[in-house]
Amino acid sequence: MNPNKEWVMRVTWKVPGDLITKWQGIVRYWMRQRNLKWNYYMHYQITWAWYTMSRYVIPIGKHGEICVDLYWHLTPEQGWLSTYAVGIQYVSNLESKYRTELDPATADSIIHGHYFNCFKERAIQQALRGHRFVFCQFPEGHKSTGQVPSLQYLALLAHQNGLRERSKRGKTRRSRNLGSKQGAVGQMAKRYVTRSQPGGEAAFWERTPVPSMELLSGGRRKTWYSHDGKGLQIL
């Protein structure tokens, strides 16, 4: 007697096959570059999930992971064998295990917080020389929070807060000429938000593409550039 067929509904994004190929190339680059402990599974290693071409498992701390499922041949009854889609879900590893679907922006925000810093260490030295950075390495992770503050603004704000704390404790003498209540450092931080970058037309825009879920789901159609200045057309 044949068992009853059980259906599992997934939230997916229909994408072209060449976009998946390009995204996989970006993932392989970062796995080598950062030695990321992401796991990759081919379709023959996923015996129970039909139409799954491959899967990427991204550990998130000790208690969860993000599973990125790449589907193919979703409509064989109509002869559309080149139909591809992407599914993203969070899987909890706690005692009470559960799964939940993720949208690309939420997944990017989680991945950004665990694997990619906003700015490289080298950017701090460049900021001291006057370069302005308004985009982090993983800007897709800030979709829900808005634009990334400039590195100068973050550094000056931290410096100003440090001055205030030391002033309260009385361990250092008060800095001179702080200006208004906000302080000269605070006013300088505001000016840096809108100040143009000296010696360049772009503000930290040329970078190596990151393995963004928004990119994979087809939500971003833009030409990105690598560090060597050569264009990489995503779509």
Swiss-Prot record:
Residues 164-188 are annotated as: Disordered. Counteracts the innate antiviral activity of APOBEC3G. Forms a complex with host APOBEC3G thus preventing the entry of this lethally hypermutating enzyme into progeny virions. Functions as an adapter molecule, recruiting APOBEC3G to the ubiquitin-proteasome machinery. Targets APOBEC3G for degradation through the assembly with elongin BC complex, CUL5 and RBX1. Binds viral RNA and affects the stability of viral nucleoprotein core. May play a role in viral morphology. Residues 157-169 are annotated as: Multimerization. This is Virion infectivity factor. Signal peptide: none annotated. Induction: Expressed late during infection in a Rev-dependent manner. The BC-like-box motif mediates the interaction with elongin BC complex. Pfam families: Vif (PF00559). The modification Phosphothreonine is found at residue 100. GO terms for cellular component: host cell cytoplasm; host cell plasma membrane; membrane; virion component. Its main location: host cell. A motif (BC-box-like motif) lies at residues 150-159. InterPro entries: Vif. Belongs to the primate lentivirus group Vif protein family. Vif-defective viruses show catastrophic failure in reverse transcription due to APOBEC-induced mutations that initiate a DNA base repair pathway and compromise the structural integrity of the ssDNA. In the absence of Vif, the virion is morphologically abnormal. Homomultimer; in vitro and presumably in vivo. Interacts with viral Pr55Gag precursor and host APOBEC3G. The interaction between Vif and APOBEC3G is species-specific, which may play a role in restricting the replication of SIV to their host. Forms an E3 ligase complex by interacting with host CUL5 and elongin BC complex (ELOB and ELOC). The modification Phosphoserine is found at residue 150. Processed in virion by the viral protease. Highly phosphorylated on serine and threonine residues. Keywords: Host cell membrane, Host cytoplasm, Host membrane, Host-virus interaction, Membrane, Phosphoprotein, Ubl conjugation, Ubl conjugation pathway, Virion. GO terms for biological process: viral life cycle. It is found in: Host cytoplasm; Host cell membrane; Virion. A motif (HCCH motif) lies at residues 112-142. It is a peripheral membrane protein. It comes from Simian immunodeficiency virus agm.vervet (isolate AGM TYO-1) (SIV-agm.ver). Residues 166-176 have a biased composition (Basic residues).
